[in-house]
Amino acid sequence: MLQPKRTKFRKVHKGRNRGIAGGTEVSFGTFGLKAVGRCRLTARQIEAARRAMTRAVKRQGKIWIRVFPDKPITEKPLEVRMGKGKGNVEYWVALIQPGKVLYEMDGVSEEIARHAFALAAAKLPVKTTFVTKTVM
């Protein structure tokens, strides 16, 4: 599972998922999976999609993960009254804005890449689209 090795602070404020995305172009591979909406991707969802893609391409080609879960999400235990401080860190998320490239792939045909990204998209809570590298 992806998570930071060390952080400056253990817990963070909830905040809001606003603004525009960075990393909107396919830069490493030839094909990419781009988010259309905004969401919070958990480390488990990122890993599940990666596994689906890896199995679909049968370990050929190369896959890049362009997102990293760097925000800790806390939860209080069940049946605990409100107050008494912030809960414990339960999982890590990456905040996704529209236009962000989530995964990239190279070394496979477009047909295989489309199939692999379709399997990966089914594991993600955000609507996505298939993009290719634009050469200028």
UniProtKB/Swiss-Prot annotation:
Keyword Ribonucleoprotein: yes
GO MF, one example: rRNA binding
Membrane-spanning intervals of the chain: none
UniProt keyword tRNA-binding, yes or no: yes
InterPro entries: Ribosomal_uL16, Ribosomal_uL16_bact-type, Ribosomal_uL16_CS, Ribosomal_uL16_dom, Ribosomal_uL16_sf
GO BP annotation list: translation
Any single Gene Ontology cellular-component annotation: cytosolic large ribosomal subunit
Keywords per UniProt: Ribonucleoprotein, Ribosomal protein, RNA-binding, rRNA-binding, tRNA-binding
Pfam families named among the record's database cross-references: Ribosomal_L16
Family matches, as PANTHER family: 50S/60S RIBOSOMAL PROTEIN L16, LARGE RIBOSOMAL SUBUNIT PROTEIN UL16M
Primary role: Binds 23S rRNA and is also seen to make contacts with the A and possibly P site tRNAs.
Subunit (UniProt): Part of the 50S ribosomal subunit.
Protein family membership: Belongs to the universal ribosomal protein uL16 family.
Protein name: Large ribosomal subunit protein uL16
